[in-house]
UniProtKB/Swiss-Prot annotation:
Heterohexadecamer of 8 large chains and 8 small chains. Mg(2+) binds at residues 192, 194-195. Keywords: Calvin cycle, Carbon dioxide fixation, Chloroplast, Lyase, Magnesium, Metal-binding, Methylation, Monooxygenase, Oxidoreductase, Photorespiration, Photosynthesis, Plastid. The basic functional RuBisCO is composed of a large chain homodimer in a 'head-to-tail' conformation. In form I RuBisCO this homodimer is arranged in a barrel-like tetramer with the small subunits forming a tetrameric 'cap' on each end of the 'barrel'. Transmembrane segments: none annotated. It comes from Tamarindus indica (Tamarind). The modification N6-carboxylysine is found at residue 192. This is Ribulose bisphosphate carboxylase large chain. HAMAP family: RuBisCO_L_type1. Binds 1 Mg(2+) ion per subunit. GO terms for cellular component: chloroplast.
């Protein structure tokens, strides 16, 4: 017969291919699929593969003008999720040709663009992505990475210390700069703009940049250490964001900051390129991540957002604290912390890692632990995150009864004590409290902090 067979057909005829052998160049995705009652899992998995690649709801004559076999996504494996009713992990392979080189934006538009609103699915969550080396090589990645950052800052063998300046909204630029100076002077490596400090009526960005630069230079002169403040360059337009980054470079400061999810991947990648070309480090905040990753059965796991950030570019990214959370959470968090830092990560389902990932020497990203932590947590943080991390104590610095500088001193003393104890072979997990107590005997600032936040 002439023509083609019109009409609606089952996706699984075309897009469910359990005998498919994945290629090294395929982008692989693991989706957690919750089909509507009565929808077989194979059909649901095939729908996801179709709608995120070449498929549409009915047969179209223009299908004959291309080779579907070459361009279609394929659902190649489905497994039920243990302990969950009617929930499956569907593995989908996408041919590399479907994606624009060096564009996280395009990768996400394809893989998670349309398919999450599908009627046949009750819920859908992207759990992990395997980025093939051929695609990774089209990205610049982090502007500098862990090693270059250490060399720029001349700080080795320990985690870095930071602090978010509070109250986050309402301070004038001069008072803000003063708070920055005191923290850096006391012994922190970095201070940080809050994610929502951009350029508001009470503190315009240029004034803040100037006073923070003054604080940095003064603290550097007094301590003999290199200091930084994450100047938030996030803005309403891409041009304005770059304008702020240019001004930071002209001031000679070491690092700027971006909210990569609210600012968007396109803006983030542009900023990362600018930062590499101009020697600026780039700190990334993940504001809005919980909108995407909080639900267990729908959205995207943070490890996917973390992988995307490593491709798009950033030298630091917030990654949760682990401390005081559930034990299982700890393994999962450490899984994506390794995905950020290491060059090669083996598949390990107990840590939430669905695919072996080879980053082909793309620079690593420093994970930032931030939120509700204080000096008593220092041994655990040092043990869990190791040297390649940034530990950020906002309230844990500024909440010190004697002020910011003593708060910074307390944190630095606690950190140095933990690192020294670890290097001497002591067990931080078991002896942590004892190590902090010993150190507080010769540091009144630490003793006062220990008293305020005793558990």
């Amino acid at each position: 017969s002439v023509g083609f067979k019109a009409g609606v057909k089952d996706y699984k005829l075309t897009y469910y291919t359990p005998d498919y052998e994945t290629k090294d160049t395929d982008i692989l995705a693991a989706f957690r699929v919750t089909p509507q009652p009565g929808v077989p899992p194979e059909e649901a998995g095939a729908e996801v593969a179709a709608e995120s690649s070449t498929g549409t709801w009915t047969t179209v004559w223009t299908d004959g003008l291309t080779s579907l076999d070459r361009y279609k996504g394929r659902c190649y494996h489905i497994e039920p999720v243990a302990g969950e009713e009617n929930q499956y992990i569907a593995y989908v392979a996408y041919p590399l040709d479907l994606f624009e080189e060096g564009s996280v934006t395009n990768m996400f538009t394809s893989i998670v663009g349309n398919v999450f609103g599908f009627k046949a699915l009750r819920a859908l969550r992207l759990e992990d992505l395997r980025i093939p080396t051929a695609y990774t090589k089209t990205f610049q990645g982090p502007p500098h990475g862990i090693q270059v950052e250490r060399d720029k800052l001349n700080k080795y063998g320990r985690p870095l210390l930071g602090c978010t300046i509070k109250p986050k909204l309402g301070l004038s630029a001069k008072n803000y700069g003063r708070a920055v100076y005191e923290c850096l002077r006391g012994g922190l490596d970095f201070t940080k703009d809050d994610e929502n400090v951009n350029s508001q009526p009470f503190m315009r960005w240029r004034d803040r940049f100037l006073f923070c630069a003054e604080a940095i230079y003064k603290a550097q002169a007094e301590t003999g250490e290199i200091k930084g403040h994450y100047l938030n360059a996030t803005a309403g337009t891409w041009e304005e964001m770059i304008k702020r980054a240019v001004f930071a470079r002209e001031l000679g400061v070491p690092i700027v900051m971006h909210d990569y999810l609210t600012g968007g991947f396109t803006a983030n990648t542009s900023l990362a390129h600018y930062c590499r070309d101009n020697g600026l480090l780039l700190h990334i905040h993940r504001a809005m991540h919980a909108v995407i990753d909080r639900q267990k059965n729908h959205g995207m796991h943070f490890r996917v957002l973390a992988k995307a950030l490593r491709l798009s570019g950033g030298d630091h990214i917030h990654a949760g604290t682990v401390v005081g959370k559930l034990e299982g959470e700890r393994e999962i968090t450490l899984g994506f912390v390794d995905l950020l830092r290491d060059d090669f990560i083996e598949k390990d389902r107990s840590r939430g890692i669905y695919f072996t990932q080879d980053w082909v020497s793309l620079p690593g990203v420093l994970p930032v632990a931030s939120g509700g932590i204080h000096v008593w947590h220092m041994p655990a943080l040092t043990e869990i995150f190791g040297d390649d991390s940034v530990l950020q104590f906002g309230g844990g610095t500024l909440g010190h009864p004697w002020g910011n500088a003593p708060g910074a001193v307390a944190n630095r003393v606690a950190l140095e004590a933990c690192v020294q104890a670890r290097n001497e072979g002591r067990d931080l997990a078991r002896e942590g409290n004892e190590i902090i107590r010993e150190a507080s005997k010769w540091s009144p600032e630490l003793a006062a902090a220990c008293e305020v936040w005793k558990e």
